[in-house]
Design a protein with these regions (language model features):
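Extended, charge-rich low-complexity interaction segments
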Residues: 6-28, 110, 159-168, 174-175
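Thiamine diphosphate
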Residues: 67-221
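Glycine-rich, acidic loop regions that bind phosphate or pyrophosphate groups
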Residues: 1-15, 120, 145
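Active-site diphosphate/adenylate-binding microenvironment
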Residues: 13-98
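Solvent-exposed, charged interface segments at domain starts and junctions
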Residues: 1-2, 47, 64, 119-123
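Acidic/proline-rich low-complexity IDRs
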Residues: 11, 21, 25, 36-37, ...
């Protein structure tokens, strides 16, 4: 039906402006958080002609924290039947028509479909960068309302912890491997070679990530 009023639009704009200012402040304060790493990754990915986002947190993070100064028009995403399945396959399919393609997926997503990298030799030449957020077993279910108040036995059911590195996966399929733990480590992305295949493992600081999440969740803006 008809809507009589939309409320105080100017107030909503002011609130959004304050929230964005808080987000920018937190990204500077917590440079090793997942959110800040996504921002930095997006700055480098902006020079690509296509970007592929894995399901779940990568899409949410990109929507909230990716850079917006350089428009990125060709952004693709896909949700498998179980969410995480087929994501790397989807990225490789999208990259087949791109000269410089970037992807950002979670660790469980990458492990689930890592064998898709066997397709690399079948693809045309091009620069491909696969970013993997390794936070030790996913983390979206930690952000659910009420999750913080659950007993430890219940919280263990919300994640799938692991201690795996993605270096061996990169080596298995002939990819260059880079590890990023700090903001300075992103400088490695300045030296990407043309027609190279690179796996970038992002290892964020959990405390900084949680600090940003809680500050934004409790912000009175």
């Amino acid at each position: 039906g008809d809507i009589d009023t939309v409320g105080d639009v100017n107030g909503l704009r002011a609130m959004n402006k304050r929230r964005k200012a808080l987000m920018e402040e937190l990204l500077i304060t917590c440079p090793e958080s997942e959110q800040a790493m996504v921002r930095s990754f997006s700055c480098f990915a902006a020079d690509g002609d296509c970007i592929y986002l894995g399901n779940s947190m990568p899409v949410r993070y990109w929507n909230s924290f990716a850079q917006t100064s350089i428009p990125t028009e060709n952004v693709r995403a896909n949700r498998g039947a179980n969410g995480i399945d087929g994501q790397i396959s989807g990225f490789l399919g999208v990259s087949a028509r791109c000269s410089r393609s970037w992807a950002l997926v979670g660790d469980l997503t990458a492990m689930y479909d890592s064998n898709a990298l066997a397709l690399l030799p079948q693809l045309d030449r091009g620069t491909r960068v696969l970013g993997v957020i390794n936070n030790g077993g996913g983390g979206i279910f930690r952000t659910l309302p009420g999750a913080d108040g659950q007993p430890e036995t219940m919280r263990k059911l919300l994640v799938q912890p692991h201690a795996h590195s993605f270096k061996a996966i990169a080596e298995q399929w002939g990819m260059r491997y880079l590890t990023i733990r700090t903001a300075e480590d992103f400088d490695q992305l300045d030296s990407l070679e043309e027609n190279s295949q690179t796996l970038v493992e992002l290892i964020p600081d959990r405390e900084q990530t949680e600090q940003i999440r809680l500050r934004l969740a409790n912000a009175q803006v």
